[in-house]
From Swiss-Prot:
Name of this chain's protein: 4-hydroxy-tetrahydrodipicolinate reductase
Active site per UniProt: 135 (proton donor/acceptor), 139 (proton donor)
CC annotations in GO: cytosol
Phylogenetic placement of the source organism: Bacteria, Bacillati, Bacillota, Bacilli, Bacillales
Chain positions recorded as NAD(+) binding sites: 79-81, 103-106
The encoding gene: dapB
Length: 240
């Protein structure tokens, strides 16, 4: 499989290493600014890339969105999470002409966590729910795209839910419809996501801990391996 990388930060550098270990070929990289240290052919426009089978994106909206406005002709795996609503609308439009895969978290374990959460919410309807995510001190966005995905699962199953980001500002007791959302930044934490169900005299915690960023890179490669054989459409872990 011949792969075009969109962005060449820490994540796509891992994708390149792991993909080549699997026997795939990196045919080029698209970056905002060409860098002498990038060890692959560099491009600025999708139309310039002639021999790729699939594109894998671990970049940011500033790089990705202008590319999506070009005539995108490759199956596309997207892991960018910024400006999510705008991104999903654009990917849905593109999926009429190419196969597109999107996930806010490329770990299959996190996908399993969303399924476990969907099963737990109806069973624990009277329990309070708090969501917490922790990441390294260089992560900019908060809360993480994965935590937003977990929140979306809850919203789809409970009515009149209210996200609470700063209880200090509220200065009032917790309301039944509140969903606490907490972000922690520190050190080199790869990624941790926890769902706390708090009931009377008992609590249940469901946690996913990423021990290496390789799980995200491998998830993107595995998605690409499947996507190249799919018809045009919008894909997630649910239907890939």
């Amino acid at each position: 499989m011949k792969i075009l990388l969109i962005g060449y930060g820490a994540m796509n550098q891992r994708v390149a290493r792991l993909a080549e270990e699997k026997g795939h070929e990196i045919v080029g990289v698209i970056e905002n600014t060409p860098k002498a240290t990038t060890p692959y052919q560099q491009y600025q426009h999708i139309a310039d890339v002639k021999d790729a089978d699939v594109a894998i994106d671990f970049s940011n909206p500033n790089l990705l969105f202008p590319l999506l406005d070009e005539e995108f002709h490759l199956p596309l795996v997207v892991a960018t999470t910024g400006e999510k609503e705008k991104l999903l609308n654009k990917l849905d439009e593109l999926s009429q002409n190419i196969p597109v895969f999107f996930s806010a978290n490329m770990s299959y374990g996190v996908h399993a966590l969303t399924k476990i959460l969907a099963a737990a919410v109806p069973l624990l309807d009277e329990f309070d729910i708090e969501l917490t995510e922790a990441h390294h001190n260089k992560k900019v966005d908060a809360p993480s795209g994965t935590l937003e995905k977990l929140y979306d699962v809850i919203v789809s199953l409970k009515e009149n839910v209210t996200p609470v980001y700063d209880r200090h500002e509220l200065n009032e007791k917790r309301q039944p419809q509140d969903i606490g959302i907490h972000s922690i930044r520190g050190g080199t934490i790869v990624g941790e996501h926890e769902v706390l169900f708090a009931g009377t005299d008992e609590t249940i915690q469901i946690t996913h801990r990423a021990q290496s960023k390789d799980i995200f890179a491998n998830g993107a490669i595995q998605a690409a391996e499947r996507l190249v054989n799919k018809p045009n459409g919008f894909y997630t872990f649910d239907n890939l």
